[in-house]
Amino acid sequence: MYPSSNAMPRRSGWTLAGAAFALSLSASTAFAGCSGTGALAIGGPGGVTPFLPFASGGAISSLIAAINTSNTAFLTQSTAFVSAPANPAPGQEGGGVWARAIGGEITTKNTTTTSNVQALGVPVPGTITCDNENKLSFAGAQVGTDIASLNVSGWNFHVGSTVGYLAAKSRDVSSVGPLNPLGGTFTDELQVPFVGLYAAATKDGFFIDGQIRRDFYQNSLNDPLVSGLFNQKLDARGLAFSGNIGYNIPLQNNWFIEPSAGVVVSKVKVDPLNVSGSGLAAFLAGGFGTFPGQLRISDINSTLARLSVRGGTTIASGSMIWQPFVTLSVYHEFQGAITSSFDGVAVTNFTGVGGLPSGLVSTSNIGTYGQIGLGVSGQIAGTGLLGYLRGDYREGENLRGYSLNGGIRYQFTPDLVAPRPMYAKAPILKAPAAFVQAYNWTGFFIGGSLGVLNGQLDMDYLAPPIAAGLTANPRFAGALGGFQAGYDYQTGKWVFGVEANINATNARGAKPCQVFILVTCEDKKDWIGTATARAGYAFWNRSIVYGRAGAAFTNTTITATCNGNGVIPIGCPATDSQSRVGWTVGFGSEFALSPNWTVRGETNYYDLGKNQYNLQQIAPAPTFVVDVREKGFISTVGLNYRFTPGVVVAKY
């Protein structure tokens, strides 16, 4: 390992049900692989191209395709799955909980151009152009909760939080070409947990919404024969804003048409990727080994705009209300090519060996594509239960694919709902007063939560002397789910309580270790728990906002992994695991859906202080002593069952 010291979206969610018609769709044909010009046109032993780890473009284009698809999979479905009762009283409280799932496959095409190549410090004339094709399969789920103020001068206002998780696998399926005789060889398996806040407003047929979201990309890259990647970990982080606006126009005989527009603006930052090169593995396979180096991908920016028209009808059948629909959309990506660079500077700084290949890489973006969606939404009349199911097909010059997604929502409904879709706006006229009960929060509760865990380790090397003073800061993120139990006591508007919870998680993270260019510092945890007190205030009849503080505890494992699959360098792996205890503080809100059931969303910050880890390498390599500080966030959406709910007073 190391050298030794000796060396519906939107307001209601029915747009979540349709999407897109393909305008000017191109035929789907396989791309033709890689070719070069000038000195870079020469493959085999007489040329420099076989020694450039990213010249084929497959690794970069696959990574960009994976991040781009993950970045837009849920965002383009609109903001969140929100709705309101059809006939709310003026100023009525509202709230609900929802969940949706999505799965599908997308194939993207792009052109990668490698230029400005140098080898042994000498410019190499020419370029390498690769027509890359990547196939990405994905599946994910998202949950959210919101509270609302309904019929405020005819407006409905919703504010909520959401968490989710997307798993995907990207495969380079590019065709064989003169400079890539093996065709596509790169794969990327990734998980993308995310957290977000959303808001929506509706009035009559008008709706507008927005969401801000934080994404955490945990990649596992594999391309042993071309790039020298052996399931190597790579982290990236994204911030995205999405917005939608539209108008629902009622037609005769329960038909409707709904034009809308939306935009997703996002930025993803990718950590540097140090690669060991395919060297030994490629030579053993009879090929030509690539050199080690570092890949730096610039920020991946996206500005994806959408224009849609949705049409359908409403059908009442017994206790069900159905709304079949079709949606036609066109999407356009306004951002241009993504730029990257690779060189051997980091290797040279550590080993003193210079002249390693370097170059610039430009990868085209997805452009314009169309989408058609078919679906149906439904509501059980007289209840707060509603849902939808939809399928989408999309195609464009550089993209084609399909997805299937569906969702369900339950919301607080104080009176019987009129026989019309729950995708309702506030009425123009004053509604009759609804029978609303003020909630009593006193009593025991148990429940479950789903969410996201993310954070960072700050590593300070103490020994051996060769490493003292060096640092590394790997981040981590993953899905989280578990159980909580506690007790609340209400006095007046104030609510005080205690709670303990325990959650399983698949949180992982990685970043290049500073002690050696070809080593990655990885961290993981399998569970985390908290024990806290909380204090809240019931601003309204059925909802509270609260703060909480107490203890956090977990077990964190740190592993130093050799990028060269254990061949180079020696000493790998080095691992240590520590149980840790620290403090946590957070805030959240909770809403009473029924006399016994409540839903909540909350975020907690935790800090576990410093612990000392001893990363013992395989002898004769030395043990590395590292001070590690851990801090992070726990964001969840939870559902609680309360054993002793009560009605304080009935209000009319």
Feature locations, PLM:
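Secretion/assembly modules of Gram-negative surface proteins
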Residues: 2-209, 216-218, 229-542, 554-555, ...
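Glycine-aromatic-enriched beta-strand/loop faces of beta-sandwich-type recognition domains
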Residues: 563-567
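Substrate-binding cleft of carbohydrate-active enzyme catalytic domains
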Residues: 222
